[in-house]
Amino acid sequence: MGNRREFLTATAAGLAAAAAPARAAEERTAAPKSTPAGAPPFGMPRDMVLLNMRRGHGYALGVKTKDGVLDVEAAGRALGMPVPADMDELLQNGRGPALRALIDAVEAAPDGRFVLPEAGVAYAPVVTRPEKIIMMGFNYRHHAEETGTPIPKDPPLFNKYNNALNHHGGTIALPTQAAREFDYETELVMVFGRECRNVSEADALDYLAGYCTGNDFSARDLQTLTSQFMIGKTSDGFAPLGPYLVTADRVKDPNNLKLKTLVNGRVRQDWSTDDMIFNCRQLISFASKVMTLKPGDIFYTGTPQGVIFGEKIPRKDRAWLKPGDEVVSELEGLGELRFRLV
């Protein structure tokens, strides 16, 4: 992993000698090849595993290290360095160079004061204020086949709202007065780090800040009431996301990742993102021709086969999810997302 990934802490006394110049920090931020003339610099740092933490009535940014979680706010305050307060500020205001400068400083003079034990972290959704939560339906060939759905010719996009956002270690209060057919959908989630409009497939991935694990939790009976999915998709807490945002440079091929779902310890989905009908590049390019994608927007890319909705028995006989169940979603290299139903 190397020293660069060992984001240790520093003392204020070591700051003057340790802090990297802003110019050097900017050189280590990712910049899309297709950056238009005059556009602001792309502000996401490279080679990081980031997380959002709940703190009081707000959120705080953390960086996962081999020793725990670097508390960005605490380190910045102690060292007198301006830093992004949370993930949303990092993404939406392009504060990557500031975060990189802080990490350079704390790596050079470690003392452990700003590293939190991860076991005690109160996770927040990776992103808490996206302008858009874009969802993709029936994007895995075998999932479409198991549900008897024709292979789509164009991406069938829909949406969730911010009330659906949830976090690693969270709970979902099932809306049992409105529905009973609750189902899991583990998905690869793309998170945007730069404004994106009318981009080519070749350049599409350059606009991503990173990737994370998500679950498109669903109420199938509400979903199938009409031709519109939304009512069965965006109840409170129906979009768990996390625990980490892994920066895009760490993911060599988002369409070659193992994906798994477990319910109460039993494997229910075990597949790969290489079964997508529309790959990540195609999804971004398609959506960018319809709307402007903004930093902090999140894009769920669909789920593979193995959902309850695809079982070949009558719906009334299926073992739909219920209060007390624990769901675990895993994406290779992106972390394990856990949540419980109540």
Regions found by a protein language model. Name each.
Residues 34, 38-41, 143, 173, ...:
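Catalytic-pocket segment enriched in acidic/His residues
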Residues 138, 160-162, 169, 176, ...:
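Short, structured patches in soluble enzyme cores that scaffold and shape functional sites
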Residues 56, 63-68, 192-194, 264-265, ...:
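Short acidic-glycine loop/turn motifs at beta-strand connectors
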Residues 4, 11, 25-155, 326:
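N-terminal non-catalytic cap/leader segment that marks the start of a structured domain
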Residues 150-168, 184, 323-332:
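Structural signature of FAD isoalloxazine-binding scaffolds in flavoprotein oxidoreductases
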